[in-house]
């Protein structure tokens, strides 16, 4: 593969349309800057960067620069017997099936509108491995756009309650109602993201 590319999707929460895509090879802090700018352009969109590998540096950039809406993932910590929250999304053996199933359902039901040719091309090569049974990129293909999209599909299915804005006592919907007087974000030319 030559390394993983960074990938980001902007999905409209109401229409479930893919309205923007970014894909490329960037250093983590530069990708953090790109996400910050994309999120800001799309009305402070909820960002859910992967925590895996260099994703910690991306999250660190966003947190250090006070990006206002970062997804927080809840996890039960058996050492302290309490639930903890961590910024970003962790893709692992337990969470990968969740995001892949959400993506499959979104595509199967035709509820998502995909506009990016590169995303569609990756989806065509994202297949079930006959030996392992795992759904993954076919040999020589990439899946960065697919995994990014799958995370977005899953998070859309569980919104509006799981996000970080510095105040974990309020839900996303309450915050948006407080800020905008309605249940979703609105800006001229850009809907809720």
Where are these regions (language model features)?
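RNase H-like, metal-dependent nuclease domains and their acidic two-metal-ion catalytic environment used
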Residues: 1-87, 93, 97-101, 105-193
